Amino acid sequence: MYIVAISLLSHTIWIQGVFFLFGLALGVISAFKIFTKTLAQKNEVIRNLEHDKAILQMSLDARRNQEQLIEEFSHKLTSVSQAFARDIKTESQEFFSEKTQAIHSVLAPMHNTLSVFKQNLENFETKQAEDRGALREQLSQLLTAEKKLERETQALTNILKHPGSRGRWGEIQLERILEISGMLKYCDYSVQTVDANDSSSRADIVIRLPQNRSLVIDAKTPFSEEYLTDSHADPTDLVKKIKDHIKTLKTKSYWDKFDQSPEFVILFLPGESLFNDAIRCAPELMDYAGQSNVILSSPVTLMALLKTVTYVWKQENLQNQIREIGQLGKDLYQRMHKLFDHFHKVGKHLGQAVHSYNDMSSSLSARVLPILRTFDKLEISSSHNKIEGLSQISTLPHSPKVPCQEPPLSECFSHQDTSSSDPLS
């Protein structure tokens, strides 16, 4: 039983062993399959990982290349930026320097102009202040002068109320105009001249004219006290007094009592207002005076007439100088003619002297000089200087010639019209 049991046990153990081995084999097979599958999966995973690794490596390489490119680009960008910044800075500095210079060149004249304008403005303000001060001073002086003039006018009005004072005032005005015209008392004119044949004919002023002629001027102050004090006075009385005085001058006939005097006399009215009022009241007054050989004259017209007389005197003096120059020209021509005669005589004698010198030189050279040179050959002379021959003079004096056939100077002046014409004709 025991053996059977052992056999059964052995058989059981063997079966169990077989089953164990079979199970183990199945397990090994399963495990191998699982391992194989797992290995395949692992290999797949490894391949995937290697692929991913390759991709990652490529990405990493690309990234590294990108980083390197970025770094290189960054360096290049930095260098380019720095160079660009330097160029921009240089160009901007040059640009701003040029623009600054241009602005300075534009603003410099403006600055100078503004400086000059400021200086001129300051000078103008200073001068304006000085002018205002001077103007105030002049206004003060003007007021003082106006007051003084008012007093003197009143005094003159009081003086001119008397007929004798009015006449003297007219004569003084006439003499002042003569002085302003450049005439000298007792030289160009005389005062209160009396005719030698008629002591009652006393002319206020007698103007000297060329060729011993005379021009008579009579001063008249024909206004009344009413005309002097009243600005609205009727000038009819003034015209009446002027006409009465014209009749008096016509009666005196000064042009017959002074030698070579023009056939008229000048009636001087010592005021433009007198002349204008008289002509305005009586326009025919000038014709009325002309018919009586009287010429009415105001201060302005008389001054123009005196300037004409001065011009006539200048022309007379010019003609006298021309006559004197003509006489001097004649004398100079005669003296130069005599001087040229002396020149001709001197030239003639010089020519004769040259011919005589040449004849003597020829005679000495032909007759005396050969003998003297013989003495030189005999060594008799103690001097070592040899006698030189005499040279001929070939240049003869030339007589002065007249450059052109002009008429003699005396004839030029002889044709000059030295006759003096009448300055008032």
Swiss-Prot record:
Coiled-coil region list: 37-66, 127-162
Region (Disordered): 392-425
A Pfam family that the UniProt record links to this protein: RmuC
Polar residues compositional bias, start-end: 413-425
Key words, A-Z: Coiled coil, DNA recombination
Biological-process GO terms, alphabetical: DNA recombination
Function comment: Involved in DNA recombination.
Family of this protein: Belongs to the RmuC family.
Name this polypeptide is given: DNA recombination protein RmuC homolog
